Amino acid sequence: MPRERGEKVVATNRKARHDYTIESTYEAGLVLTGTEVKSLRQGRASLVDGYAFVDAGEAWLDAVHIPEYNQGTWNNHPVRRKRKLLLHKEQILKIHSKVKEGGYTVVPLQLYFVDGRAKVELAIAKGKKEYDKRQTLRERQDKREADRAMSSHRRLGE
Protein backbone atom coordinates (compact mmCIF):
# COMPACT_ATOMS: atom_id res chain seq x y z
CA MET A 1 0.00 0.00 0.00
CA PRO A 2 1.26 3.49 -0.74
CA ARG A 3 2.19 5.70 2.16
CA GLU A 4 -0.11 8.55 3.12
CA ARG A 5 1.14 11.92 1.99
CA GLY A 6 0.72 14.99 4.07
CA GLU A 7 2.17 17.64 6.26
CA LYS A 8 3.34 17.35 9.83
CA VAL A 9 3.76 20.74 11.49
CA VAL A 10 6.73 20.81 13.87
CA ALA A 11 6.79 24.45 15.00
CA THR A 12 4.91 27.68 14.39
CA ASN A 13 5.91 31.27 15.04
CA ARG A 14 2.66 32.70 16.41
CA LYS A 15 4.35 35.92 17.52
CA ALA A 16 5.33 36.77 13.92
CA ARG A 17 1.77 37.56 12.81
CA HIS A 18 1.37 39.78 15.88
CA ASP A 19 4.65 41.69 15.46
CA TYR A 20 4.74 41.96 11.66
CA THR A 21 2.51 42.75 8.71
CA ILE A 22 2.94 39.85 6.28
CA GLU A 23 3.51 40.89 2.65
CA SER A 24 4.14 37.55 0.91
CA THR A 25 5.14 33.99 1.81
CA TYR A 26 7.52 31.41 0.35
CA GLU A 27 8.11 27.72 1.00
CA ALA A 28 11.77 26.77 1.27
CA GLY A 29 13.61 23.53 1.84
CA LEU A 30 16.23 23.23 4.59
CA VAL A 31 19.70 21.72 4.52
CA LEU A 32 19.91 19.81 7.82
CA THR A 33 22.12 17.22 9.48
CA GLY A 34 20.79 13.83 10.55
CA THR A 35 20.49 14.68 14.24
CA GLU A 36 18.61 17.89 13.38
CA VAL A 37 16.05 15.91 11.38
CA LYS A 38 15.62 13.40 14.21
CA SER A 39 15.17 16.20 16.73
CA LEU A 40 12.57 17.86 14.48
CA ARG A 41 10.69 14.58 14.10
CA GLN A 42 10.34 14.58 17.89
CA GLY A 43 8.60 17.96 17.49
CA ARG A 44 11.31 20.01 19.14
CA ALA A 45 12.05 23.42 17.61
CA SER A 46 11.53 27.13 18.24
CA LEU A 47 11.20 29.80 15.55
CA VAL A 48 10.69 32.77 17.88
CA ASP A 49 14.01 34.58 17.30
CA GLY A 50 14.55 33.24 13.79
CA TYR A 51 15.16 35.29 10.67
CA ALA A 52 16.39 34.72 7.14
CA PHE A 53 18.88 36.69 5.08
CA VAL A 54 20.59 36.56 1.69
CA ASP A 55 24.38 36.40 1.51
CA ALA A 56 26.36 35.95 -1.72
CA GLY A 57 23.31 34.80 -3.66
CA GLU A 58 22.34 32.16 -1.10
CA ALA A 59 19.50 32.28 1.43
CA TRP A 60 20.21 31.40 5.06
CA LEU A 61 18.06 30.82 8.14
CA ASP A 62 19.61 31.96 11.42
CA ALA A 63 18.76 31.93 15.15
CA VAL A 64 16.30 29.04 14.88
CA HIS A 65 16.58 26.81 17.95
CA ILE A 66 16.66 23.06 17.21
CA PRO A 67 17.70 21.29 20.42
CA GLU A 68 20.19 18.44 20.43
CA TYR A 69 18.87 14.97 19.67
CA ASN A 70 18.36 13.02 22.91
CA GLN A 71 20.05 9.83 21.72
CA GLY A 72 22.76 11.71 19.82
CA THR A 73 26.41 11.09 20.56
CA TRP A 74 29.43 13.36 20.19
CA ASN A 75 28.24 13.93 16.62
CA ASN A 76 25.28 16.11 17.70
CA HIS A 77 24.64 19.40 15.91
CA PRO A 78 25.06 22.92 17.34
CA VAL A 79 21.73 24.16 18.72
CA ARG A 80 21.73 27.54 16.94
CA ARG A 81 23.55 27.67 13.62
CA LYS A 82 23.03 29.11 10.17
CA ARG A 83 21.07 26.71 7.98
CA LYS A 84 21.00 26.98 4.21
CA LEU A 85 17.60 27.51 2.57
CA LEU A 86 16.72 25.89 -0.74
CA LEU A 87 14.91 28.42 -2.93
CA HIS A 88 14.76 29.22 -6.63
CA LYS A 89 17.11 31.96 -7.81
CA GLU A 90 14.20 34.28 -8.70
CA GLN A 91 12.77 33.89 -5.20
CA ILE A 92 16.13 34.70 -3.63
CA LEU A 93 16.43 37.82 -5.80
CA LYS A 94 12.90 38.98 -4.89
CA ILE A 95 13.59 38.48 -1.19
CA HIS A 96 16.94 40.26 -1.44
CA SER A 97 15.45 43.25 -3.28
CA LYS A 98 12.61 43.63 -0.74
CA VAL A 99 14.96 43.46 2.26
CA LYS A 100 17.38 45.88 0.61
CA GLU A 101 14.46 48.27 -0.01
CA GLY A 102 14.33 48.92 3.71
CA GLY A 103 11.85 48.28 6.47
CA TYR A 104 11.34 44.65 5.47
CA THR A 105 12.63 41.48 7.07
CA VAL A 106 12.22 37.76 6.41
CA VAL A 107 10.77 35.73 9.28
CA PRO A 108 9.94 32.01 9.51
CA LEU A 109 6.25 31.31 10.11
CA GLN A 110 6.14 27.52 10.20
CA LEU A 111 8.47 24.53 10.18
CA TYR A 112 6.98 21.29 8.87
CA PHE A 113 7.57 18.06 6.96
CA VAL A 114 6.13 17.39 3.50
CA ASP A 115 6.61 13.81 2.30
CA GLY A 116 9.52 13.37 4.71
CA ARG A 117 11.34 16.56 3.72
CA ALA A 118 11.75 19.47 6.12
CA LYS A 119 10.28 22.74 4.86
CA VAL A 120 9.98 26.21 6.30
CA GLU A 121 7.37 28.82 5.42
CA LEU A 122 9.06 32.22 5.15
CA ALA A 123 7.32 35.59 5.10
CA ILE A 124 8.51 38.94 3.84
CA ALA A 125 7.23 41.17 6.60
CA LYS A 126 7.23 44.75 7.80
CA GLY A 127 7.39 45.48 11.52
CA LYS A 128 4.26 46.85 13.20
CA LYS A 129 4.31 49.87 15.46
CA GLU A 130 2.83 49.56 18.95
CA TYR A 131 -0.37 51.39 18.00
CA ASP A 132 -0.83 49.05 15.00
CA LYS A 133 -0.64 46.05 17.33
CA ARG A 134 -3.22 47.59 19.65
CA GLN A 135 -5.51 48.40 16.73
CA THR A 136 -5.27 44.82 15.43
CA LEU A 137 -6.14 43.45 18.88
CA ARG A 138 -9.07 45.87 19.16
CA GLU A 139 -10.41 44.85 15.73
CA ARG A 140 -10.08 41.16 16.60
CA GLN A 141 -11.90 41.69 19.90
CA ASP A 142 -14.70 43.69 18.22
CA LYS A 143 -15.15 40.96 15.61
CA ARG A 144 -15.30 38.30 18.33
CA GLU A 145 -17.94 40.28 20.25
CA ALA A 146 -20.01 40.82 17.09
CA ASP A 147 -19.86 37.09 16.26
CA ARG A 148 -20.86 36.24 19.82
CA ALA A 149 -23.82 38.66 19.67
CA MET A 150 -24.93 37.26 16.30
CA SER A 151 -24.77 33.65 17.50
CA SER A 152 -26.74 34.42 20.67
CA HIS A 153 -29.30 36.35 18.60
CA ARG A 154 -29.67 33.36 16.24
CA ARG A 155 -30.13 31.01 19.20
CA LEU A 156 -32.79 33.20 20.79
CA GLY A 157 -34.50 33.96 17.48
CA GLU A 158 -35.13 30.31 16.56
Curated annotation (Swiss-Prot):
Chief location category: cytoplasm
Chain residue ranges for the region called Disordered: 131-158
A molecular function (GO) term: RNA binding
GO cellular component: cytosol
Disulfide-linked positions: none
Subcellular location: Cytoplasm
InterPro entries assigned: SmpB, SsrA-bd_prot, SsrA-bd_prot_CS
Matches recorded under Pfam families: SmpB (PF01668)
Annotated GO biological process: trans-translation
Alphabetically ordered keywords of this record: Cytoplasm, RNA-binding
Role this protein plays: Required for rescue of stalled ribosomes mediated by trans-translation. Binds to transfer-messenger RNA (tmRNA), required for stable association of tmRNA with ribosomes. tmRNA and SmpB together mimic tRNA shape, replacing the anticodon stem-loop with SmpB. tmRNA is encoded by the ssrA gene; the 2 termini fold to resemble tRNA(Ala) and it encodes a 'tag peptide', a short internal open reading frame. During trans-translation Ala-aminoacylated tmRNA acts like a tRNA, entering the A-site of stalled ribosomes, displacing the stalled mRNA.
NCBIfam families, alphabetized: PRK05422.1, smpB
Name recorded for this polypeptide: SsrA-binding protein
